[in-house]
Amino acid sequence: MIAASMDRKTIADYVYRDSGIEATGLIPKNMPLFSAPDSLMSFNMALASNYLERSKIGQKKEKIDISYVSTSEEYRLTSFLLMDNLRKIGVGLDIKPGTWSMNWDRARKIETSPNIISMAWWPTLASPSDWFFGLYQTEENPLFNLSYYSNSSVDSILDLAWRNESLYPEVSRGLYKDIQDSLIKDCVVIPVVDINVQSVHQSNITGLKKNPAYSTLLIYHLGKMR
């Protein structure tokens, strides 16, 4: 229901514009070993309404909530667009903005965790395994697995995919695709956009290079042209 109510194209085109492109999977499409999943749900409000009728939410008319980082205009607009789409099929969405530290603290406690949390993942390794280990591997005390997802089959496939990356990359590519399809089937995550990280600097600064892994680490040998 929620996945079918998420209008990724509108969000990518009008909210993120040049700072993001529509997601085609659970990891960025330019990531090594990426292969698009078969089961990614398209924006379809009729389908969302159908799922609602079959769900417990539709029977009880309960509200759901979403938290997002309050300093991000893109997260705010995305949340309000989802709220508007869900309202069309009779589902209320409570918007709960906050600082990342506050949202993270609440999400790590099951008693205060929201139904949906809007977040981006900043990888420390240019590999699909970084997303899947960090966000979806079974954890007794969740760190970033804020959906509290636990699936022994996915855990096993993830371990196998990671071990085969160097010697058998095409095997890993297929396994990472299988993991994406499993996560989508289990309604764990709804991908929206692949974010393009931007760097602004004076034209006479040299040595600034893109970091393909953890892009917010700004450690460079900078110089200044005279």
Task: Give, region by region, the residue ranges found by the protein language model.
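Extended ligand-binding regions for polar small-molecule ligands
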Residues: M1-D13, S150-S166, E170-R173
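Append "and occasionally in soluble cytosolic enzymes with long acidic Gly/Pro-rich linkers
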Residues: M1-I89, S150, D178
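Hydrophobic, well-ordered secondary-structure elements that form the walls
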Residues: I2, I66, L86, A107, ...
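Conserved catalytic core of Hanks-type protein kinase domains
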Residues: S5, L135, S182
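Flexible loop/turn segments at secondary-structure boundaries
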Residues: E22, F34, S72-Y75, M102-W104, ...
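Short, solvent-exposed loop/beta-turn-alpha elements that line the ligand-binding surface or hinge
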Residues: P32-L47, I57-K60, R108-T112, F133-R163, ...
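Bilobed periplasmic-binding protein-like "clamshell/Venus-flytrap" ligand-binding domains
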Residues: R54-S70, P114-A120, S166-S203
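Periplasmic binding protein-like
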Residues: K88-Q137, L175
